[in-house]
Amino acid sequence: LKLKQIDGSDFDLDTLKGKKVYLKFMRFASCMFCNLEVNHLKNKHNEFGNNFEIVLVFHSSVENLKKQMKKHGPLPFTVVADPDFSYYKKYEIERSMGKLINSFIFKLPRALSAILKGYIPIKIEGYLDIATADFFLDKNGVVLDIKYSLKDSFDGFEFSEIKEFSLR
């Protein structure tokens, strides 16, 4: 996986060999649920183990992603842009309008929390109907576990699972 980071520099997933990685394919940069997740991961980052990295992939241009992530301040993990959707296809990330609708039905309290934090997607740049997906990679870059969204667009690993993986 080779993409641009929010500062415009190149990122290569292979540079993280030797570390465990939580790789998450998000939706578009202004997605309210995604921004809530970024905020949560930033606030809980000190609970993760050593030798562990988080990489978040957004279907967005670098410019838009940088603008949207600015509200979070400095982030202790890697955020990259895949404006062409190429790695989403390679990793078989699904697009589903049904799962998007289910997200608002099943995750209404989460949506309200995002709105209260000001994560309102005024400008949508990217596919609206991406069903997120989570990957745990071992120190050699081998996929250990995958969680594709099943019932809604944000059906990924729970925080407790991510934390446990980071501490193993």
Label every PLM stretch briefly.
Residues L1-D14:
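N-terminal "domain-start" segment that seeds a small globular fold
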Residues D14-K42:
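Short active-site neighborhood of thiol/selenol oxidoreductases, capturing the structured segment around
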Residues D82-S153:
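Thiol/selenol-based redox catalytic cores and closely related redox-interacting motifs
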Residues D10, K17-K19, N51, A131:
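A structure-centric signal for secondary-structure junctions around beta-strands
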Residues D152-L167:
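A short, polar/charged loop-to-alpha-helix boundary motif
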Residues E37-K90, S96:
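Structural microenvironment flanking redox-active thiols in thiol-disulfide oxidoreductases
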